Amino acid sequence: MKPQTRTRFTLSLLTAGVLCASTATWAANVPAGTQLAEKQELVRNNGSEPASLDPHKVESDVEFNIISDLFDGLVSVSPAGEIQPRLAEKWENKDNTVWTFHLRPGIIWSDGTPITAEDIVWSWQRLVDPKTASPYASYPGSMRILNGTDIAEGKKAPESLGVKAINDSTLEVTLTQPNAAFLAMLAHPSLVPI
């Protein structure tokens, strides 16, 4: 292939890639009273089959796309970089080290069972537990969650993770030091309750 032809071909591929990557998909704003189709179905061209649908085991965008479609975490990050409430309707912190999250009322699992703060505690403890062998076991430690690193390294029990349920709808997370990125880090797919 001639250098000029190769350059044009490469530029064409790059342009096509940029155009594909820049198209955003957004959920529709459906006005109240709108009659929806009887069958609600999401079809996603994901490129390949997922290796796992366990949020603590996934490692690729293929799985992350599906996890994001199926699960919600405490917060999400908008395309503009703003923290948005998801399972948590509000939160406050003391000295940027003790964070209290108040779960939205009425959040439920697919079987209708309420999602509680204890479900989140159990999920995060499972994430850091070396027995789970999660590729993201070190993530809570990176977030500066109390005992996260020691648990992932097998030095402490998962139950010592700095997260506790105050009641069914209130979660408290204790950090070892302030972390300016903490709220944004909560949007990671490995932190969704399971």
Task: Specify the residue positions occupied by each region the protein language model found.
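Soluble periplasmic/extracytoplasmic beta-strand elements of cell-envelope proteins
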Residues: E41-N45, T100-H102, G162-K164, E172-T174
